[in-house]
Every structure is written in C-alpha cells, then in structure tokens.
Amino acid sequence: MLQHPLSRTELLIGKDGLDKLRNSKVMIFGVGGVGSYTVEALTRAGVGTLILVDDDTVCLTNLNRQIHATYKTISKVKVEVMKERILSINRKCEVITHQVFVTKENIPELIPDDVDYVVDAIDTVSAKIALVEYCSAKGIKIMSSMGTGNKFDPTQFKVADIYKKIGRASCR
C-alpha cells in the first residue's frame, strides 16, 4: 500500500471510510478545553471541512488544558490559532472560522445547509440549549458535551442520549 498521511486510518476504516471523512463537513462550536481536542482528532482523522466557532482569545489559564494554548499563542484569536494548527497537520482541510459569541439568534445564520455534523463544546447553557434545539428541528446530527470541569472521578463520566434522563441538570 502506498504510504500517505492517513495510511494508518485507512487500514482501520478502508478507502471508503477515508473518503467519507474527507467529504464530511463538521462544525465545532467552542474550541476550548473540549473543542480544541475534538478539532485535533477530526483533523488527524482526515475530515475534509471544519467550521470553527468561538469568540474567545487564548489566555494564560488555557495553558493547562487547551491544545492550541502556548505562550506564543496567548492573546491570539482561538479559531485562528486552531486554523493554523489544522493546516499544519492537514494542508488539504478546508477551514472556515467564525469569531462570534453564539446566541439563539445567530445560530441559523452560522450553520450551513450542507453541514454533516455539529459538535457542541460551548459553555453557555442558553446557547447550548438553543443549538441542540435548532439541530434537532433541522435533523442535523449533533454531539453535545455537557462538561466535566471540576470533576475528579472519571468513573462517573457518562455517554448517553440527551433525551434520556442521566442525572445532569444541564441535560434536562
């Protein structure tokens, strides 16, 4: 087999799987603690188009938990720092950035009609709810992180359907 940057991934999922990733458009809301690692994984998996949404800049307190945070990136716009990182890993990836605070009102104008998946990694509960409701109404597949900040017992981490009761107030 001819070697290329995604050769190992191709061994796992085959050429068809690789093509599916390459032709996918994924939108990530929030590129902080959860979102930056999500973007990194999607980039390294070979997703063809990534749309990043975050209004924040990198700060000193991000150094311990956000993949794009270094002393060189402090005070820089997170989505732009992440875009530069993505393109240093996968030059063929199309990266679209929006430096904007997510609200119920701007969600419809941000999400393109042809998006395949949405990842919710935002902290603001009202925006999180609005995003899930919008995607649900439009039939857009969404993965939502309810956050694990200040949690010390990894055995308590749960993955579940948001519509099933799992005991987190932010999921009700």
PLM regions: where:
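Glycine-rich phosphate-binding loop and adjoining beta1-alpha1-beta2 segment
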Residues: 47, 52-90
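Conserved small/polar residues in nucleotide/adenosyl-binding loops
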Residues: 169-171
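A structured beta-alpha segment of the ubiquitous adenosine-cofactor-binding alpha/beta core
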Residues: 75-116, 122-125
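ADP-ribose/adenylate-binding Rossmann-like module
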Residues: 117-160
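Hydrophobic/small residue at the entry helix of a nucleotide-binding pocket
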Residues: 34-35
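Conserved N-terminal Rossmann-fold NAD(P)-binding element of oxidoreductases
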Residues: 28-30, 53
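N-terminal charged helix/coil linker that caps or initiates catalytic domains
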Residues: 1-27
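Aromatic pocket-lining residues of Rossmann-like dinucleotide-binding sites
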Residues: 42
